Design a protein with these regions (language model features):
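Donor-nucleotide binding loops and adjacent catalytic segments primarily
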Residues: 199-309
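Residues at the starts of beta-strands that form the adenosine-phosphate
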Residues: 14, 33, 117, 213, ...
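Nucleotide-activated sugar donor-binding and catalytic core shared by glycosyltransferases
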Residues: 1-16, 26-33, 86-89, 134, ...
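Short, well-ordered alpha-helical microsegments
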Residues: 23-25, 102-106, 319
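Phosphate/nucleotide-donor binding subsite
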Residues: 33, 37-91, 151, 158, ...
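Conserved nucleotide-sugar donor-interacting segment of glycosyltransferase catalytic cores
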Residues: 72-151, 202-203
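Generic beta-sheet signal
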Residues: 18-20, 37-40, 119-122, 198, ...
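Short gly/pro/ser/thr-enriched loop/turn and capping motifs at secondary-structure boundaries
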Residues: 24-25, 41-45, 124-131, 338-340
């Protein structure tokens, strides 16, 4: 969202970012106005268990329901209040919301005459249901039998998710808003006046029931790094060996034993260069084999063009950036939106999904070697790369926003 805001600012728009206080320095460093969320909406995503301690032992559907009840649902009143306070202090021509920001629902469920246009920004896979595939991890199937299975799967999901739906509707009622007209995942995408999905169509399940208000704008890629001090080992990239990059991103990176450490060990005896981007200082003791290099930060726009395989827990931005360069992927992830991303990697053929957040060394090693040995994975990744070249996210987002500003 920060990258989107910077694009709009460079196009001449005055931007105010409303987000948690933990992002204050990043927003100000980007030259944008910052307003902090307040109350329980102002939590630190890096320490969710401190703010939402009951999530600690939950997994699977129970964890998803908990997130939507409490992380997203209970924060609606404070998020809504903050938006309205900004609107009361200054003219607001348009509101751009991240997809899980349910605090815009009270405005979206009210009269259009009482609010500016609201645009949703899809920085995770498209969440709304479709007749063409079942909820969560199933892939498209439009055969008669498949359509029936899809319907049954969607019904089962909505039934199991009903406690979260009821909870969110109760919170909305306290805000003076009517209940959601559709399931919450649908409402995220169809309630806004326009919804911009930040990837290309080649990296999303096709659907025959796509609303007209949803547009693909291509991936929002980081700005090219201006300066970068190459680490001492940088010339190793020219050794002729396969280059493997492993990362756990910047959120689910508290435990390197989930992916980074087992990847280093799985490939320790292979004739390849394995680079771990930790996303934070690696304060704990790590075992670093001779063929591995570890850095807390490396600009991916510099490194990914040299990479043969990306091993990741499936962050949307990282995966889209890799595919924009035609890099095939081995993905392991269950937290946040990452299981949905894994399903799309597998469906496109641009990589291998390990189907778990905690893969074994054997699983990782086998998958990496398979991707390196079979050119079809890189071919599919490069096909997505060609699709991405048809888009210019900054231009598309700017045009979409300006079309709604009166």
């Amino acid at each position: 969202m920060l990258a989107v805001a910077q694009h709009l600012s460079s196009a001449g728009h005055d931007i105010t970012i409303l987000t948690a206080g933990v992002f204050r320095e990043k927003v100000i460093a980007a030259g944008l106005d910052f307003v902090s969320l307040t109350g329980i909406a102002n939590y630190d995503y890096r320490h969710l268990e401190e703010f939402f301690p009951d999530k600690r032992n939950l997994r699977g559907m129970d964890l998803i329901i908990y997130y939507f009840k409490h992380t997203f649902g209970d924060t609606i009143p404070d998020q809504d209040r903050c938006i309205r306070q900004i609107m009361a202090k200054r003219p607001v021509d348009l509101i751009l919301v991240d997809v899980p920001y349910l605090g815009a629902f009270p405005l979206l469920l009210g009269s259009k005459n009482d609010r500016p246009p609201i645009v949703g920004c899809g920085v995770v896979p498209l969440l709304m249901r479709s007749a063409d595939f079942g909820r969560r991890f199933s892939q498209p199937d439009t055969t008669p039998e498949g359509l029936l299975r899809n319907k049954e799967a969607n019904c089962r999901f909505e039934a199991s998710f009903q406690p979260a739906t009821d909870h969110i509707n109760a919170v909305l009622a306290r805000c003076g808003a009517p209940p959601m007209p559709r399931p919450v995942f649908d409402c995220m995408c169809v309630l806004p006046d326009l919804f911009l999905q930040c990837t290309g169509e080649a990296f999303e399940f096709p659907r025959s029931d796509m609303p007209d208000t949803i547009r693909f704008v291509g991936p929002v890629l980081p700005k090219p790094s201006v300066s970068f001090d190459e680490p001492a080992w940088w010339s190793d990239l020219d050794s002729g060996r396969a280059v493997v990059l492993v990362t756990q991103g910047t959120i689910a990176n508290f435990n390197f034993d989930e992916l980074i450490q087992p990847t280093l060990m799985a490939l320790a005896d292979d004739d390849m260069l394995v680079i771990a981007a930790t996303g934070r200082p690696a304060t704990e003791l790590m075992v670093v084999p001779p063929n591995a290099r570890v850095e807390s930060f490396i600009p991916f726009d510099r490194l990914l063009p040299e990479v043969d395989v990306l091993v990741t827990n499936g962050g949307y931005g990282t995966v889209n950036q890799a595919l924009s360069l035609g890099v095939p992927i081995v993905v392991a992830g269950e937290t946040e939106d990452k299981a949905l991303i894994s399903a799309r990697v597998a469906w496109t053929g641009a990589g291998i999904s390990l189907g778990t957040q905690d893969p074994t060394q054997e699983q990782i090693g086998t998958a990496v070697r398979a991707v390196l040995a079979d050119s079809r994975y890189r071919d599919r990744a490069q096909a997505i790369q060609q699709n991405f070249k048809e888009y210019s996210a900054p231009d598309s987002i700017t045009r979409a926003v300006e079309s709604l500003i009166k």
